Amino acid sequence: SKNTQPAGDVPNVVVYEDSQCPICKDYETQYGNAMLQLIDEGKITLEVRTAYFLDDQIEQTPNKKSSQRAAMAAAAADAVGKYREYHKVIYENQPREGVGYTDQQLRVDFAAKAGIAGDDLATFQKLYDTKAYADFAKKSFETMGEAGIGGTPAYVVNGKKINLESLSSNDPQTVLTAIQSAASGSN
């Protein structure tokens, strides 16, 4: 989709998140719409690097590897042009920590809520079922460690963490100011 690739003239925000992380859900709820507006206005670009370290840290019986499966599902949704919608649905339906996501949720229910249907649904489900994005998800997760990010959520620009928690407002201009401040190294 537009304005998702880094461009030299605007800040490129990199978000590290784990779909089972409750604080990631809070950040998505609080700052997600502002970030999307800034992307649509061409004021920032944004990359999401999905982690799945919580898969090893919390019991998820019987829904093992929930964060990894959600990361692969989100990548499959992107392949059919529905990343934004699917990403939003994942967080809107985040289970209580330790419960995890079922395959039914990830491949059927969330796809429907994100508006994936017809041939796109068949493509999405095939990509999910064959784990087509397993390597992509693994590489995305590995970038977190390579960047020295110790936990999620982390919003980073030019290698500097954006200090969102100190903001007085979550309106797009306030968020943009925080991004620009971090980008220039003055936060």
Please annotate each region the language model reported.
Residues A112-N187:
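C-terminal cap of thioredoxin/glutaredoxin-like
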